[in-house]
A protein has these predicted regions:
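Glycine-aromatic micro-motifs
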Residues: 1-172
């Protein structure tokens, strides 16, 4: 059986979740993916973590060793290949070494949005489990929310305040 190295950056940082999802997976290291940023995409109030290229940014990650069965289970949980695709990326480990491992990345056609409270809490616990700086997670949520609302404004999906007040566009 060939083992595979897997990069986690979202809810699969959560140790209890990974223990449940992939009972034979082993946490083997922590590090960063350089020149990528964490984002939340999907539905407006039910978005999930993904990563995207962004020069100068980095994403903290956990490195898991997966058995073939673990990978099949993760494929199902991650909605591979319809929701996420797989890619091999370099990881800079905290000990200074670098290696390449598999990561799930959301299909690019998804819009920015906000994570549900329960999903955010799961990712937050993962950040705590791994000892990561919460700043990256909170910036990702804020940036994704900002882009979501910008998209609404650009597409004129907000009603004007006058219409909301039932004044037929008249100002008082």
């Amino acid at each position: 059986m060939k083992k595979k190295l897997y990069i986690a950056y979202g809810s699969n940082l959560n140790l209890n979740q990974m223990k449940y999802r992939c009972p034979t997976a082993k946490l083997v290291g922590k590090g960063t993916i350089e020149n990528y940023e964490l984002q939340f995409k999907g539905m407006p109030n039910c978005s999930y973590a993904t990563i995207a290229p962004c020069i100068g940014k980095s994403v903290p990650v956990a490195l898991w060793e997966l058995q073939p069965r673990d990978e099949k289970l993760l494929d199902r949980y991650e909605g591979y290949p319809s929701h996420y695709f797989k890619q091999d990326l370099p990881v800079k480990l905290n000990n200074g070494s670098e290696l390449t491992a598999m990561v799930y990345i959301m299909n690019l056609k998804q819009d920015f949005g906000l994570p549900s409270a329960s999903y955010y809490d799961t990712v937050l616990q993962g950040y705590k489990d791994c000892g990561f700086d919460m700043k990256v997670l909170n910036e990702a949520v804020n940036d994704s929310a900002e882009k979501y609302y910008e998209n609404l404004e650009q597409n004129n999906l907000f009603d004007s305040p006058d219409e909301d007040m039932g004044m037929g566009g008249m100002s008082l």
